[in-house]
Design a protein with these regions (language model features):
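Short glycine-aspartate micro-motif
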Residues: 98-102
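Acidic, divalent-metal-coordinating active-site segment for phosphoryl/phosphodiester hydrolysis
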Residues: 106-112
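Helical "lid/coupling" subdomains associated with nucleotide-phosphate turnover
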Residues: 3-4, 8-37, 47-97, 112-115, ...
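Conserved beta-strand/loop subsegment of P-loop NTPase cores
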Residues: 40-44
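Short, basic and Ser/Thr-rich N-terminal targeting/leader segments
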Residues: 104-106, 175
Length: 274
């Protein structure tokens, strides 16, 4: 469920009431499903949008009161560590220098690692919801708007490269909805099959081709592309642009897709503590 909890954060600095309501409805539905299936223990975390929002703690309080779900707001260091746990669960790193690209709605994280040890981290405000709100207003895409988005990404990614110093990745891994959607589109995987998505690889040329096709389409035409999840039809442009410009900035010809990420990292942490 794509509820766009971080919508409006750039301009308001807080979670929008309607998006909080949408998210609370989804959480309530999740809670009901759990109650109908033996009431297993729940572990919920919040990241960028709730972490940064002036009313983030209000949202957490409401979630507890209205749904019974305890949400923990985790710092970026813990988010990065748990994300890597999930990513490397089924993708061997072979002691290579890796950049893991985690694209969210409010932010995008760049996690540097070698031998599963984090050697660097950079969190940016390059989230797909934020970028779409700021740069994209027309579908099919207006080229002037897209050029502004592209220039912004290139500028921000140069700052990321500078912060990460001389780190040169041997492997680029992508996680979250944008990259899994790109893999599904490239390989025409429908219905969605996580086992076919995980560890799949697409090239810079693949990303360029998919982006060019998406830019020409209206929102309804994109939705007709079955692998594309409803609610992602406008966000996929900014997401694909992030992927493509990252590949260019770090001179990576391919990206390996991880179906597993923060959620699986949390599960592994729980299992390992038993």
């Amino acid at each position: 469920n794509i509820t766009r909890l971080g919508e409006g954060m750039d301009t308001q600095g807080k979670l929008a009431k309607n998006r909080m309501e949408d998210t609370l409805q989804v959480l309530a539905a999740f809670r009901q499903t759990c109650l109908e299936n033996g009431d297993p223990p729940l572990f919920a975390v919040a990241t960028s949008a709730v972490r940064e929002a002036s009313n983030g703690h209000e949202f957490v309080h409401r979630a507890k009161k209205e749904t019974g779900i305890d949400i923990k707001i985790i710092p970026w260091e813990e988010e990065a560590r748990l994300t890597l746990e999930g990513v490397f669960w089924k993708i061997p790193d072979n002691n290579r220098k890796v950049i893991t690209l985690d694209i969210g709605g409010g932010s995008t994280e760049f996690i540097l690692s070698q031998g599963k040890e984090i050697s660097g981290f950079c969190s940016t405000s390059l989230g797909v919801v934020r970028l779409t709100e700021k740069f994209i207003s027309r579908h099919p895409i207006d080229e002037k708007e897209f050029l502004s988005l592209k220039n912004h990404l290139q500028k921000e990614l140069q700052a990321v490269k500078k912060k990460l110093s001389t780190f040169r990745p041997e492997l680029l891994i992508g996680t979250a909805g944008t990259v899994t959607t790109l893999s599904a589109l490239k390989n025409n995987i429908y219905p969605y099959d996580p086992e076919k998505i995980h560890a799949s690889v697409f090239s810079r040329e693949d990303a360029e081709s998919i982006l060019a096709d998406l830019k020409r389409k209206s929102l309804s035409e994109r939705l007709a592309m079955k692998p594309l999840e409803p609610g992602r039809e406008d966000l996929i442009i900014a997401g694909t642009a992030i992927v493509l410009e990252t590949m260019r900035a770090f001179d990576c010809e391919t990206l390996t897709v991880s179906e597993y990420s923060l959620r699986e990292g949390i599960i592994l942490k729980i299992v390992n503590s038993i």
